[in-house]
């Protein structure tokens, strides 16, 4: 089973600059984030080689969170070739996340 990519200020830009990525902004104390975590793990496995499934710990990456204006968590950013193209806030279904990823992978 594939694992998501943990993003930091150091690897964020280089990781998302090419292709499609889903970036989950989360925190360890966040109940809804914990509910979403297994879905993120499943997507990382299902989309291996097609899209990057990533997570940003907002407690550890405050500057990165501020850069993207993250005010509520979980916040999910969908990127294509380094540009944010869609954003969802709150717990989402796996179906909704797959739908958005598949649209971007087109």
Curated annotation (Swiss-Prot):
Boundaries of every Thioredoxin domain copy: 2-106
State one Pfam family annotation: Thioredoxin
TM spans (from-to): none
Gene Ontology MF annotations: protein-disulfide reductase activity
Note the CDD domains from the entry.
TRX_family (cd02947)
- Which key words are in the record? Disulfide bond, Electron transport, Redox-active center, Transport
**Which branch of life, at top level?**
Bacteria
InterPro entries named among the record's database cross-references: Thioredoxin, Thioredoxin-like_sf, Thioredoxin_CS, Thioredoxin_domain
Q: One biological-process term from Gene Ontology? A: cell redox homeostasis
Disulfide-linked positions: 30-33
Q: Which family does it belong to?
A: Belongs to the thioredoxin family.
The UniProt function text for this chain reads: Participates in various redox reactions through the reversible oxidation of its active center dithiol to a disulfide and catalyzes dithiol-disulfide exchange reactions.
Protein name in UniProt: Thioredoxin
């Amino acid at each position: 089973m594939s694992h998501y990519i943990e993003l930091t200020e150091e690897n964020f830009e280089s990781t998302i600059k090419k292709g499609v990525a889903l970036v989950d902004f989360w925190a360890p104390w966040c109940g809804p984030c914990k509910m979403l975590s297994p879905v993120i793990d499943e997507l990382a496995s299902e989309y291996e080689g097609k899209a990057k499934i990533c997570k940003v710990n907002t407690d550890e990456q405050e500057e990165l969170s501020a850069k993207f204006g993250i005010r509520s968590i979980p916040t999910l950013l969908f990127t294509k070739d380094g540009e944010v193209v869609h954003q969802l806030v709150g717990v989402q279904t796996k179906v909704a996340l797959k739908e958005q990823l598949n649209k971007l992978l087109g």
